[in-house]
């Protein structure tokens, strides 16, 4: 999580590789002269505008495939509709959202899923959630996992606050589902064993701007980092922690493994899927096992080793997404 995160951060990562991927009609749309800007609006209003085919001149044009990269498709797309499904947070955890989003987002999300010619899910866990809400969509849903390899080629930039420190890294916003408070509250038990240990939190404050209790000694909230600083933090952390209670994919876990970090995650299905047997998985409700695993990692080597085989790149995600598009066009 550097300048941004989630689907909004992943869209440019995905679409850049489509140009050299030879993606026929997509390639024709990539010159600046053919890019149409959209009206800027709050998330819920943006979803409604896109569903109604408004807010951009592009909605009046004809395409081979209309790709909804972030949850929503126009209700009558001028071309086959391909929808990328990241998660179901407005339905799974409505209490995390304000009243307007709770009321307005689920309808466009579910309608887009039902009307899409094909669906791309970012994980098997997300496809399982999809089929729970829209069972008839199972045959139409393809899994194309995301990638974390974007930081591999980025030169490291030192994070001065963490220089020569033993630290655990957690990447994510401070919303309830990310469960960062769970780590903050257990940190005094870690510093009882390792007095100089630092919990480095990278990311924005809570979506809802809740008032925060004072953090205990050793907790550092770093806000946003550049890509180079984030890469440095992953590579130099004693351990990366992912205590989230619900994810669509789990990009920080993927990035941590790709950069050789030791990793502890919750037992969330998406987290377990993305990290497999290369991470320690613990229930994120009992602090005892987490304290034991973190203190063990603080006393061990910083690196878990290189990932086996090749690291998945965003070009792989683009290629597999194009394959689904081709099936849609030829079906």
What annotation goes with each model-predicted range?
Residues 1-331:
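Carbohydrate transferase catalytic cores enriched for Leloir-type hexosyltransferases
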